[in-house]
Amino acid sequence: MGTVWHAWDPSLQRDVAIKEVLLPAGMSPKERAEARARTLREAKATARISDTAVVTVHDVLEHDDSPWIVMELLRGTSLQHHLDRNGPMPVERVEEAAKALLGGLRAAHAAGVTHRDVKPANIMLTDDDRTVLTDFGI
């Protein structure tokens, strides 16, 4: 759960995506601390994955008591949005996407990371024809 922002990294002179992880209201201080720690731990684990089919995590930090994740900016649309707008994809494109996703999941598992929320909304179809897993359940 969270909001993703398009931002500029002045240090590295590049566009990035920044995700503010929104913690549910009404959590006790202990629950908030545990959720923040889990988010930071999961973001660090995701950053270990190196594969073109997995979004690259550049940094993770805390600001105003909320975790923030700095990631590669992906230009394109989610698979969910694409399907809602265009209907089913051609079989050849589905095969390409499936192969990419399996490669990304293989790389994640090799890094000891399990994607806990694979669904069309968490798969990006980029403008440069990549299929990319995002949001590892963080």
Where are these regions (language model features)?
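Conserved N-lobe loop of protein kinases adjacent to the ATP-binding glycine-rich P-loop
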Residues: 8-16
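AlphaC helix of the eukaryotic protein kinase fold
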Residues: 22-48
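Activation-segment/catalytic-loop signature of the eukaryotic protein kinase fold
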Residues: 60
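Activation segment signature within eukaryotic-like protein kinase domains
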Residues: 97-98
